[in-house]
């Protein structure tokens, strides 16, 4: 028996054809570029004709594969080399953003070209966002006029939702920030964005991508202050953006104040230390006293676990608030602060149903402890209260208010007799 393995026959000199689906098309952006530029040259500067050409070409050319090349051409007139320069040996077109007039109306017209293209070929959306992020990193490679056009275009595209505000991350590039390119670009961008929408819409878009608290990073670390930001953008004609950032900073400072205040209270820090800290924060962050009393009130009320039984919670509240009266009194030196506190108490007692019967007792306690005075209480009773539970609370306060009025009249007549 032959134990040797039988040799398998081989086919020599035979060539096998690769299946069509296994063939990989060669990546050739130059050929794609030539087709697009030739078409744009034929359409000329009529942007409606450009939009129609791009719409029709998507059926013949591979936009999905050559998205970056397509957008390079539409923005810069040709394929961009790293750093943002146009290759000398490549074809170029003047039918592009950078060769257009430097005005908002022209950029709005170009924005429509991008809108139509991306609406027609939805898969280009991601590629376009990546392109804009790249272009922002290349800003130093562009002329000032090119940067201005790109900024205006980006602002319009952010306003109409073609772009997501996350693209602004590219502006926080260290080199762009250090050389002042980011801040200058942001001025033009926000002007066109706010011109299309308003500051509230801009703020909502920034909040959506957690960019609302990062705008100061457009400046180097040594210039990241509210004062510098507001001065720079107000002088550039963007007062509403300056005010928005100032408000954001104030909101952040208030949250930080409340957090620190609650920690100090839970540690049992002396009131004099807490008062000193709060007053320093008020001065540093320009927080008015009526705002601070609201923060102190909610901090005081959140430091205790309240009894769920209505008949016991009033007694517990009075005991707790009596202890904190000196702290509250330190921040009711203005009539408006007292009125704010009264409204906070009203809202708290309404929102926490077990406190509904405690409202009058809390107000009387604060009157005796000189946290509240007659005039704001009478004003609250007459016309400064809010709708929440007003019939219940006004009824509770009726006798005390009558007593206050009588006491006031008696003191007035005593003063007249003394004269």
Curated annotation (Swiss-Prot):
Residue numbers bearing the N-acetylmethionine modification: 1
| Residues the record lists as Phosphoserine modifications | 12, 411, 413
Its GO biological process annotations read: regulation of translational initiation
| Molecular function per GO | cadherin binding; RNA binding
Annotated Polar residues bias: 1-15
Under InterPro entries, the record lists: ARM-type_fold, eIF5-mimic_regulator, W2_BZW1/2, W2_domain
GO CC, one annotated term: membrane
Function, in words: Translation initiation regulator which represses repeat-associated non-AUG (RAN) initiated translation probably by acting as a competitive inhibitor of eukaryotic translation initiation factor 5 (EIF5) function. Enhances histone H4 gene transcription but does not seem to bind DNA directly.
The record's comment on protein family reads: Belongs to the BZW family.
Q: What is this protein called?
A: eIF5-mimic protein 2
- Origin organism is Homo sapiens
